Amino acid sequence: MHGHLLVSISSIFSDTRKQTSNLLKELDREEIPVSLLVAPHIDGNWHLAKDDKTLGFLKEQESAGRLLILNGFDQAVQGRRAEFANLDSHEANLRLKGATRQMAKLGFESSIFAPPRWRMSPGTLEVLPNFAFDVAVSTRGIHELRSGKFHQTRNLSFGEGFGAAKWWRRNIIRAAERSALRGNTVRLSISGRNLNDRKVVSDFIKAVDRAASAGAQPADYGVFLTKR
């Protein structure tokens, strides 16, 4: 039995929109679905509500069937630390309220939540069912919030705080292929901030291709929305 191949891009804003679009076109040609991780704020000084081009781009992608996943409130709010990695339930609840309200005003309402860098505190996981989320995704795996079911499948990342050095990329390519050969679900993600480096992009596509060739079935995270 084959697992899924889940590909995603994060850190999508004015500086990375063009590069994100280029990668999407390449993966679309290979019929690889890609989920987009989006947030209302990035780095404290970029705001989706004030960026008409990125807003329009995301709406076009969603209208075309692309899955958008809420990726926090402000990715850099705690400097180098991931936003939802250490929050208690009260703080997580406040940030989720802010993020969901602001995204709803812009016309986006996602059923899936993935914290920045995929790092999710127990307090965050505790309060997510209070919102309209059906699925949450962390470094460890995929949580079905209504049933409580958990699918253990670690994320393999280029960037997003995990690095994108050549040795790291080689390890990710091998890990993706091995995992697919075992019939496991393979999760591959890349930060939009790393898409300027053509070698990084090439190796990311190689990891996707190796996993698909080894039997992982391309899908987006929405496949878990039907398993409630």
Give the predicted meaning of each segment:
Residues 1, 34-35, 60, 190-228:
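C-terminal domain-boundary segment and adjacent tail
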Residues 1-64, 201:
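Active-site beta->alpha N-cap acidic-glycine motif
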Residues 8, 19, 69-71, 132-136, ...:
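Glycan-processing catalytic domains of CAZymes
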Residues 11-19, 39-54, 114-123, 161-169, ...:
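Acidic-and-aromatic substrate-binding clefts and catalytic sites of carbohydrate-active enzymes
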Residues 17-23, 49-61, 138-148, 164-178:
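Alpha-helical scaffolding within the catalytic cores
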Residues 33, 37-123, 185-192:
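Metal-dependent polysaccharide deacetylase catalytic core of the NodB/CE4 family, i.e.
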Residues 87-158, 196-202:
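Catalytic domains of cell-wall/extracellular-matrix polysaccharide-remodeling enzymes
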Residues 149-199:
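A conserved mid-domain beta-alpha-beta active-site/ligand-binding segment of alpha/beta enzyme cores
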